[in-house]
Amino acid sequence: MDAHYAPAGFAEPPAPPASAATQPAAPAWAYEARVPAAASSPSCSGSSPSLKASYEDGHPSQSESDVLQRQTFTASHQLPGYATTPQATGMHSSAATELFVAGPLPTTGTLPPPTLSAYQHSSTFSNRNFATTSPLVLQDSSFNTTSNGILSPHDPLLQIKTSQGTVPTALAFERLGSSALSNSVPPQSSTYRSAQESAPHLLQPQFSLLPSTLGGAQQTPQAYNSALFPSSAASIERALLRECSVIKHHQRPSVTQSIQAQLTGSQHPLHSYLSSASIGNFQEPSRQSSLSCSSVRDSTQVSNGVLPQKTPQVSAELAQSYSSVIPSSGYLPSATKVDSCSTKQPLTSTTIPKPQSVIPPVQTLNYSKPLHNQSSVISGQAQIYSTAQLPSLLSVSQSQNYGLVQPHNVPSIVHSQVYRSSRVEKLPSLYKTLTFSGSSQPVTSENQTLSYSSNQQEVLSLVTNENYPAQTRDLPSVSESQNYSSGQSQGLSPVSQTQVSYSSQSQVLSVVSPSESYASGQSLTLTAPSLSYSSASRGQSLPVSTPTPSYTSMHPSPNAQTQGSSAQPQEFLPAVQSSFASSTRGQTLQSSIPSPDPKSYAERKLDSSVYTSSKQDEFPVQKLQALQSQASLESSSQRLPDGEVNAQESVYKTSKADDRYSQSVTRNNSHLEDQVVGVALQGSEQEENMVGSMTQLNQQSGQSNNAVATDLKKATNLMQTPQVRLNTKDLNQQHSLMHKMHEAKVQQQHDQIMSASSQIQIPNPALGQSHQALPHTSVLLDSACDLQILQQAGILQASLGQAKASLQVQRVQSPQQIVHPFLQMDGHIIQSNGEHPQQQLHPHNSDIMKLDLPEPSKPLQQLTTKGPFSEANPHDSKNQFVSLGSICFSEAMLLSDERNILSNVDDILAATAAACGVTPSDFSKSAANETMQDIESSDSKSHYQQSLNVRHVNSDFNSIAASVGKPQSINDISLNGNQVSVSLSSVPTLQSETVLDQPHMETPSQTIPTKVPSAMVGLGQEIQEQSSDPFKKQLTINHESKEDREIAVDSALSNNRNQEFVSNSRSISGDSVVSERDFTLVGDDTGVLVNPRRSTLALLAMPQPGDAASGKTEDEKQDVTYFNLPKEKAKGKEQGKEEEDNQKQLKRSAQCKRQNPRGTDVYVPYTSPSLESCDEGFQHQEKMRQKIKEVEEKQPEVKTGFIASFLDFLKCGPKQQFSTLAVRVPNRTRRSGIQTTRTFCPPPFAKTSPAAQAPSETGGVSLSEKVDSELKTLEQLSSFSSDEEDPGSCGHDIYKNTSAPLTVLDATSDKTKKTVLEALPVATPGASAETAGVAPTASTAVATIKQDLHLTSLTVNTMENANSTESPTAIELDSLPSDQLAKGQDTVAIEGFTDEENIESGGEGQYRERDEFVVKIEDIETFKEALNTGKEPPAIWKVQKALLQKFVPEIRDGQREFAATNSYLGYFGDAKTKYKRIYVKFIENANKKEYVRVCSKKPRNKPSQTIRNIPSKPSSISKTSDPPVSKTTTTKTPSTKPKAKQLKIKAEPPPKKRKKWKEEFSSSQSESSPEVRSSSSEDEGFEPPAPSVTRFLNTRAMKETFKSYMELLVSIALDPDTMQALEKSNDELLLPHMKKIDGMLNDNRKRLLVNLHLDQPFKNALESFPELTVITRDSKAKSGGSAISKIKMNGKAYNKKTLRTSKTTTKSAQEFAVDPEKIQLYSLYHSLHHYKYHVYLICKNEISSVQKKNEDLGQEEIVQLCMKNVKWVEDLFEKFGELLNHVQQKCS
């Protein structure tokens, strides 16, 4: 395409295949327009004016706005062809722009005749559009193949023509990656998508058909196009009808039953869809299923079976294959089909699907079947789509589609059709692959099915390699592969896969994703959004749904990609079904996101109409023929479920329209609402059913429900409508059943996607997208509706600024956030997410823009495309265009450094573009080769590669999404990303964006984007920053003024790429922020101020990637780090060394994170990821350091560029940090509002000059590397004041600022959560807004670097934390190696801060007042933060006269302790004024080191006195003072708490004995009292020398100890549980005293034992019976009278600890004859042993006497009254002393 549209800047993307090239100009333009949006970043920059003009031209007027919206939607979403697309086209040439604008504008139906003409002119491509199953897909496809130069080389449509096998995937991917993977993948994506949408498995044939006739593809688009091109509703409708009939014929041949059924059902596409979903309509699809899945009993039965039959089957299947499927009425059929697929899928790649698990098969089945169901849905859809699209693909597509669903061969198509790939994140890939498989359909199809089933790398390799082998290598391939790979390999990491799929789908769906995701509900940009919308929440879900399904898939992905996929398909299917059932309406709604689509849909009223509108929007420039085809198809689909569809559609429309309305489609809404009025009645019944099912789904999705609160009705309507469409009756029955089954099976088949769908929330949290689960289930129904509504509302809102959208956005925001990783692809979803969604959309735009970043203008264009992708098309589009204008990458943006950053942005943008349906061909172009290699390298890589490749942007995005679940993938991606980075500037941008989008997705994006995206991000970011500055401001204002999507969308559009990029990231977890920051980084010099928000977003998103890296390992948590990495890499320029690049990127991203947070006011939540990253960085300091060293060794070149500076920084400190900071400071300053709050420890950087920015990033890394040096470095930074010495504390600071954002991410890391949360309170207040804004850069950099090593899991956690705003700390902790984080401590006892007396300090250790410790005043804040977060705090110093002994922090048993060192400082003169006393407790002396811990509160002096005096207190044996004696004492009283251990400090037993003692009293506290040692040595039989007991007993300390002892005994007498409670709480007031007394008693008792040689029975009796009676009587022996003595022991046995009488039957009294001379010794021994019990009894008596005098007294009062009886206490003390003295005398 570039070749064809070189002037537009499409030159960047590889020229489309000849077929594409040869496609009519209009279609090419249409596609190009779309693709450029997604993949023509360069085009954007190159033809920025044109793009901007065309975009703005479109934007100014409502119709234009609508068009733009559509375009935006298309470009952004599955509307790659949306405004951006047209503009991209326009950018290519004004004629193209006009054409495109004209093309998309007609979608609104308000386009000027010329536009319409132009649009109609592309009616040929309309066929093409139809050929591309989804309108968007078609559009994309058209754009790609026919009108998108970007798609040219790999245009799936084109390639479908030329190479059905490979191209289909590419095509589908093209649809997906049309924006993202425009060059290679887009075509494939597009076509594939359309093929997938209509007949996923037939994609290849479809493709081949599409290129030539676009018949099959056209057919699907017909529905879509109908929806898409409502303006030409009548003609298009007629055309569609004709095409439908044609398609019917075409389809029948391939899949007679399925197609016929499809057509029949297709006639009611929604009906069919509903049927599929309901099983009733799925009959035909089922039949198809049968055909395809004859082996699959369920499918066959379903298809052949009647609805009832199908329902049971569905139930079974659902239960078995798609509990997820159940959620939506469409799901049942899906499930059913899934089963078919399952059986079938296993055929092709039984192993893989099976490995995937039951779920995989289920998923596969789900996919296949959901496909099938979707297929049916798609059948219905495909009939809507297929019908439209199937003309070419028709027989094959439909056939295959259904074949996949039903026939074995069809699986591909089924995937395609079902849009498994789209629906199922995995499936999308798989599906795409399947579609791709068109040529090698059976295997590929199976593979894809399998792939999705296996959902994992197996499939990836199988599908990706087989289906996608070339394509995987190929950009399109990669796109698919990645999508697929992502979906699949990330199927491994369900999130990854799902996300990838979704990403891919979302992106591809966005690009191709609309088609794919939609059915791919997202394949149609409109479709996907529509689907999303259509799915209601589902529509949102589509994007969300796609993302959501993706999410579902993604989240379930961990369980099973299949599961996730299934869930997605379920979600998707329901979404798709609903969507399709609502058919194109949902799509149109999606399309509607741009007003034109909804409008056109409303106009058409038909889902297909909506679809057409959507489709039209998607590739408005496609031939009107295609549109007409769509119209025909549309009419066909309308016809099929016309009543149902209409009713459902209306209902759907109503809810959707409202959503759309709020989002961006005002007129559409009106039409939709009008229709809804009529349809609502029809659908009311169904709606009720739908509502019921939706309720179920809502219940399942839970989260989404809230989001649907305002739009719940709408959502329910939407859901109902789609589902009603599915099968009004069957739907009612089956949907309910499905839902029930879905719910039941979701739980049952947690593995399965449905489960994923329902439970996706859980997986999502891993992804940091708790909403993903919602999106699936909830999205399906509630979320789907809500999301859809939200999306629409957000988009409409963005355009219309409706409050409703904001509500929806807010409500959906949670769901959306979860969905966001996928949603990030779907701008509408992002918008649904409110600000975040919008921003995510914008990041998508950004991605798209960046996609073409190789040509600075291209990113703009893509961004623009994405902007349209953002649901708020009218305003957003405008803003986006403005943004684009600004974004038109300035020279500065293209600076090498910036460029690297932009490279990252490009990656992200590319991914976003792909997600948005923008062709990523630009990106793909530059990054295709490397990307392909990378993709081949790994799934994550694959994703990354996709991201890198313009066509793979979607993949990248997908991969990111997918990689979220796969930390490994991320690393691979990172490495690949590095390569790519070098090779592709723009690709990296795409990747970056993708990554940013996926930071939530996590790893893949983290790693890959980190590498390649870096450069791209640099460019795109700068450009975006420049262009987005005003918008950013506007965004900020808007966001602040409105939380709705409109503002978010506007912002996003304003920021376009970055914003969109940000949106995606943000949506996911905070990636948005990262993305923005990323961009900010890029625009440090040129566009810092321009796009501060975006920068911030990028930064935040970057932190997210770091999290993703961590999460990848852990759970697809953070893409932030990797996002950061890409930037870093970008900065480091394209280092060949992937690892080094990764590190660089990580560092860079960390820096970016820090930097970006400054400007992320709107995206405050995303700062948290940054913080998290920072934290993680700290956690992984050592690992990072090691890694850096390794990198240096392995890749000496690494020392060049960013890494070199970073390494230097690590060596010299944070000087460099300031440069990075400086660049970002403006952004931060601008965004300081909210961003400031989120800013973390790095704020000082903000203060630093721009020159410090790069260093600051490196500084961040260095922080992570050298905690101490870093701490000092940070000290220099004002923002790191509290944690100057501790990078951890710095991270903590950052966390403080980003605590809310991090909290969102917290879900994944509970461990860290605690610490982080603890740290958060301190840190949040700590960093100043702006200062923090800057400082985070360094901190983030550190976190990023470390993340590269360890943060993957943490990153994932961070992502999740991003979702839950309170877990920043947790993430932070997670980011640090567990061994580097200690248990958090909320407060620190520092003189002047916590000097309250009479407060127990609690905790282990002995407070010794004589020990004076101090801490530097300047370190106090850092110290507090570090302790709070568990990070390494500054050292403390022990005052030793004129010297200070240094105590350094250590972690022992998870506790932060300080160990003595041999370092000393002088402590005299002025030095004394620089320190504050800090209260510590002595733990123990071990290894010749003294260990202390810092008190949280100032301890009372009493314990310390006791402890001090105990050594000197006389033991009854006079041994107490001796350490051994005290040790013995402790041992003797096991009841005494282990705290006694702390007493051990003064005297340690010999090493061997000490070890034994330690084991024995490991739990006891090591106090420096000899008692403990006494106790210990007692156990060892060590008898210490007897001290003079009298001497001790007479001391005041001894009296205090005894008094405390008595106080405790009185308490125990009142409450036997007191002792246990005190031991649990490590009481430090009373327990030490009791232990001391017990130790003394044990010590003396042992000394007596030495003199008493007791028999064991006698000894046992002495110790068992508390009462002893001496019996002496004279024996009357003949010899004279000799005294005979006996000792009688009796009494009740008691518990030695609680002193309660034992309930066990006590032995009868025992008598022992003893030596009269030793009776006194026995008595003494007995008294010592039972002394506590005896005193306890005395206390009980005293208590009873007190209670008699004073009734109604509480325990405290009684204890106080007893203790006030001084005489009583002193008498007991005297008796105690006498006892000990007596023992001493006897033993001496």
Swiss-Prot record:
Annotated protein name in UniProt: Glutamine and serine-rich protein 1
Gene assigned in the entry: Qser1
Residues recorded as bearing Phosphothreonine in the entry: 1003, 1394
PANTHER family: GLUTAMINE AND SERINE-RICH PROTEIN 1, GLUTAMINE AND SERINE-RICH PROTEIN 1-RELATED
Pfam families: DUF4211
Subunit (UniProt): Interacts with TET1.
Bias type Basic and acidic residues, positions: 1126-1136, 1545-1561
Superkingdom to which the source organism belongs: Eukaryota
Region spans: Disordered: 1-69, 472-498, 532-617, 1104-1163, 1234-1264, 1494-1588
Known function: Plays an essential role in the protection and maintenance of transcriptional and developmental programs. Protects many bivalent promoters and poised enhancers from hypermethylation, showing a marked preference for these regulatory elements over other types of promoters or enhancers. Mechanistically, cooperates with TET1 and binds to DNA in a common complex to inhibit the binding of DNMT3A/3B and therefore de novo methylation.
CC terms in the record's Gene Ontology section: chromosome
Modified residues (Phosphoserine): 670, 940, 1041, 1262, 1281-1282, 1401
Tagged with keyword Phosphoprotein: yes
Cross-link (Glycyl lysine isopeptide (Lys-Gly) (interchain with G-Cter in SUMO2)), chain numbering: 1112, 1137
Primary localization: nucleus
Assigned keywords, A-Z: Chromosome, Isopeptide bond, Phosphoprotein, Ubl conjugation
Biased composition (Low complexity): 1-53, 1510-1537, 1562-1575
Polar residues composition-biased segments: 60-69, 478-492, 532-569, 576-594
Compartment(s): Chromosome
